[in-house]
């Protein structure tokens, strides 16, 4: 038997918890699901996502965070990708990002579909992907 897990959530360390909570909930329409204190080392976490918990993002703030800028070229996270239904929805997202003042790449077409990149308040790269024909 082959067991293939599915990605359920991602946890990000952010420099300003409230700024990130506001940004992600406003842009993606996520709900705030839980606020929690870390049991080890202090700090706080806010879980945002779909109300049914089928997909969520954990935003963490650690008291030892010195406000370093995210760097995708270092070992660790490169980017976080979200899927959309098709290229038409990707175009809608391109307009939504522009309307909210979020800088973004142009839509790039690939053999496998299309993508669009942008960054969050901590400069973490996010990607929207539409699989299938362009």
Which residue stretches match the model-derived regions?
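Short, conserved charged micro-motifs
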Residues: 19, 88-92
């Amino acid at each position: 038997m082959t067991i293939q897990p599915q990605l359920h959530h991602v946890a990000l360390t952010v420099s300003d918890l409230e700024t990130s909570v506001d940004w992600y909930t406003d842009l993606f329409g996520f709900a705030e699901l839980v606020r929690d204190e870390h049991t080890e080392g202090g700090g706080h976490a806010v879980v945002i996502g779909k109300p049914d918990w089928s997909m969520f993002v954990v935003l963490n703030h650690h008291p030892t965070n010195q406000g370093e800028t995210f760097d995708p070229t270092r070992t660790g996270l490169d980017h976080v990708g979200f899927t959309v239904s098709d290229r038409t929805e990707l175009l809608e997202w391109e307009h939504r990002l522009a309307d909210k003042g979020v800088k973004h790449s142009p839509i790039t077409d690939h053999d496998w579909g299309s993508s669009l990149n942008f960054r969050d308040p901590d400069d973490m790269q996010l990607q929207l992907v539409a699989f299938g024909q362009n």
